[in-house]
Design a protein with these regions (language model features):
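Class I S-adenosyl-L-methionine-dependent methyltransferase catalytic core
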Residues: 1-157
Length: 157
């Protein structure tokens, strides 16, 4: 019998957002909040850290979110739920999330498919000092008040 290792599992939960990816999106969205950052890796003028827990805060304006994720982190779904619920209640809120493209999961179909836009990332963005991109596909989920979901691809080049 073949052995199986889960290449999508990660002990590390605090990967820095790839700068090229963020900069390209920031030109479009002009982010003011980084919703899940550290003091060392925050990408926006305003940000929440583990200490002031973005899940417990009010969100407004244009927000970037690279939530902690991995098979050991059930909190990622909490971030997605909050992004969806808050954008439905606040017309001034846009949340752009970078998450794994786990299209086979219930949470992806129940929550992400209600987003205003889903952009499938072409290629494998590199996080931190890694030589290679993640071994899993990533997606940008854009939550804002909308009646339909738009699907596109996002090219880093």
């Amino acid at each position: 019998m073949a052995s199986f290792t889960n290449k999508f599992d990660s002990i590390k939960q605090d990967w820095n957002t790839p700068k090229l990816l963020f900069n390209k999106l920031n030109q479009e969205f002009n982010f003011i909040f980084d919703l899940a950052a550290s003091k060392e890796n925050a990408l926006c003028p305003k940000f929440y850290t583990k200490d002031n827990d973005g899940l417990k805060q009010s969100w407004d304006g244009s927000c970037w979110l690279n939530p902690p994720y991995g098979d050991k982190s059930s909190k990622m779904v909490d971030w997605i739920k909050k992004a969806y619920n808050d954008t439905q209640a606040n017309l001034n809120l846009t949340v752009v999330m970078l998450i794994p493209a786990r299209t086979n999961t219930k949470w992806f179909h129940d929550l992400c498919m209600k987003a205003a836009e889903i952009r499938f990332i072409l290629g494998r963005p590199k996080f931190g000092d890694s030589k290679h991109g993640l071994p899993q596909p990533l997606v940008l989920v854009i939550f804002k008040k909308s009646d339909e979901t738009k699907f596109t691809s996002f090219n880093l080049n």
